[in-house]
Swiss-Prot record:
Chief place where the protein resides: cytoplasm
Protein location: Cytoplasm
Name this protein carries in UniProt: Shikimate kinase
Gene that this sequence comes from: aroK
Superkingdom classification of source: Bacteria
Pfam family, any one: SKI
Gene3D superfamilies: P-loop containing nucleotide triphosphate hydrolases
Assembly behavior: Monomer.
UniProt lineage: Bacteria, Bacillati, Bacillota, Bacilli, Bacillales
Amino acids binding substrate: D33, R57, G78, R134
Record-linked CDD domains: SK
Annotated catalysed reactions: shikimate + ATP = 3-phosphoshikimate + ADP + H(+)
Function according to Swiss-Prot or TrEMBL: Catalyzes the specific phosphorylation of the 3-hydroxyl group of shikimic acid using ATP as a cosubstrate.
Entry keyword annotation includes Transmembrane: no
Biological-process GO terms, alphabetical: amino acid biosynthetic process; aromatic amino acid family biosynthetic process; chorismate biosynthetic process
Length: 165
C-alpha cells in the first residue's frame, strides 16, 4: 500500500486521525513534526524562535523525503503544503488526504495550546488569514474530508471508504 499523507491546518485532527487509521489498517504512523523534533533535539517552537520559519520548512522538506513511502501513514505539519516540492512528493508517493475544519472552530480548540508556534490567540483573524493562504494547496489533495463536528470514527471510516473505492 502506498503511503497515506494526512494534511490540513493545525488543529484539524491530523495526529488523532492518523493514530486511528494506523490502528484500523495495522500500519505505522509517523508524524513529521515529531521526527523533526527528534532529529533537531528541540521542540518546533524553539526552532521557529532561534532559526525562523524558513529553516523549519527546509527541515520539514528533508524529513518528508527521508520517510518510507509504503505501508505507512504520515501526518504532516500544517505548513508542509506551502512548498510545491512537498505537494508533488506526496502526490507522487502516496495518497494525500486533506482534513478540513472550520478555522474558527480550530481557533477555539487551540486557545490554550502553547505548543503551536503560528497560533496567536490574541489574533484569530491572522490565524484564519494564514489558513486561507494555504487553502488552495490543501485542496490539491485527492481526498478531502470536512472534520468539523464529526467524530474520530466517522472521519476514519470515511477515509477508509474513499481509499478503498
Amino acid at each position: 500500500m502506498r503511503a497515506i499523507y494526512i494534511t490540513g491546518y493545525m488543529g484539524a485532527g491530523k495526529t488523532t486521525i492518523g493514530k486511528a487509521l494506523s490502528k484500523e489498517l495495522g500500519i505505522d504512523v509517523i508524524d513529521t513534526d515529531q521526527k523533526i523534533e527528534e532529529k533537531q533535539g528541540r521542540v518546533i517552537r524553539d526552532i521557529f524562535a532561534k532559526e525562523g520559519e524558513r529553516s523549519f520548512r527546509q527541515y520539514e522538506s528533508e524529513m518528508l523525503c527521508s520517510l518510507p513511502t509504503k505501508d505507512v501513514i504520515i501526518t504532516t505539519g500544517g505548513g508542509i503544503v506551502e512548498r510545491i516540492e512537498n505537494r508533488e512528493w506526496m502526490k507522487e508517493n502516496g495518497t494525500v488526504v486533506y482534513l478540513y475544519c472550520d478555522p474558527y472552530v480550530i481557533a477555539d480548540r487551540l486557545h490554550e495550546d502553547i505548543t503551536r508556534p503560528l497560533f496567536q490567540k490574541e489574533n484569530v483573524e491572522a490565524f484564519v488569514a494564514k489558513f486561507e493562504e494555504r487553502r488552495a494547496f490543501y485542496e490539491e489533495a485527492v481526498i478531502q474530508i470536512d472534520t468539523t463536528n464529526k467524530s474520530i470514527q466517522e472521519v476514519t471510516e470515511e477515509i477508509l471508504r474513499r481509499i478503498n473505492s
